[in-house]
Amino acid sequence: MANCFVGDIQGCYDDLRRLLDLAKFDPAKDVLWLCGDLVARGPDSLKTLRYVKSLGQRAVTVLGNHDLHLLAVADGVAPLKKKDKLQALMEAPDRDELLTWLRHRPLLAEHPDLPIMMVHAGISPAWDARTARNCAREVESLLRGDQYSWLLHNMYGDLPDGWSEDLAGIERYRYIINTFTRMRFCYFDGRLEFKCKKGPTESTPGLRPWFEQREHHMDDPILVFGHWAALMGNTGRNDIKALDTGCVWGNSLTLWRYEDDALIATPCPTHAK
């Protein structure tokens, strides 16, 4: 059995299937791990959701910012934008079934037997692994419960940008969501910054990638994430794997296989802007 981790798909269904063929992924025995942002910007968000859902327990995916935004659009919180290419999904007969399934995906996923943790954007430098797990469960329970509409209506915003155990209510939930789904850079004091989407060498002075501010402990799991295409897979750390390589922007879709540490990529030139 192989554990195959894939970066942001964003509706690029054909590229995903081509990559899985290249990696010889076998859904009868392998497990597909997806770093979130299954939908938006690419041509086939509907096919992508249907396929991943059809894999059942052979697919593990976490929520990304585009996935949450889709849920917000469906709930009337945000407008449907043409550039997101979600119209077919919104009009699909199985829309509600797919969105309910998506709403029940986690913010953080872990392998039950291997030292691997997966999120979409990252884990706050202020959190250890236990805090990250607990924070993820807090928001997941809201998304899966009666308060999910309230949460979607109030999740947008950049503040608070710093963590405190005293945070409560929507301010606490917003920080948790932003950390797991939007974060790239932090200020040196640990506060989150959301405007810069460039790579570390092009960033504004005073900012550092979130993973450079995380201390490494020997018993920490390998952390796998997506979201940050400008990294092109480079974190400079063996314990932190970045897998978003900009498929929807015409670069490539990348798969990392845990068992042999193989990186497999397929070019996606048809999406070049």
UniProtKB/Swiss-Prot annotation:
Membrane-spanning parts: none
- What InterPro entries does the database record attribute to this sequence? ApaH, Calcineurin-like_PHP_ApaH, Metallo-depent_PP-like
Is Hydrolase one of the keywords?
yes
Among Pfam families, the record links this protein to: Metallophos
Query: Which catalysed reactions does the entry list for this protein?
Result: P(1),P(4)-bis(5'-adenosyl) tetraphosphate + H2O = 2 ADP + 2 H(+)
In the UniProt record, does the keyword Signal occur? no
The UniProt keywords, alphabetically, are: Hydrolase
**EC number(s) in its UniProt entry?**
3.6.1.41
Tell me where on the tree of life, at the top rank, the source sits: Bacteria
Q: State one molecular function term (GO).
A: bis(5'-nucleosyl)-tetraphosphatase (symmetrical) activity
For this chain, the family text in UniProt reads:
Belongs to the Ap4A hydrolase family.
Record's function text = Hydrolyzes diadenosine 5',5'''-P1,P4-tetraphosphate to yield ADP.
Name used for this protein in its record: Bis(5'-nucleosyl)-tetraphosphatase, symmetrical
Quote the gene name from the UniProt entry: apaH
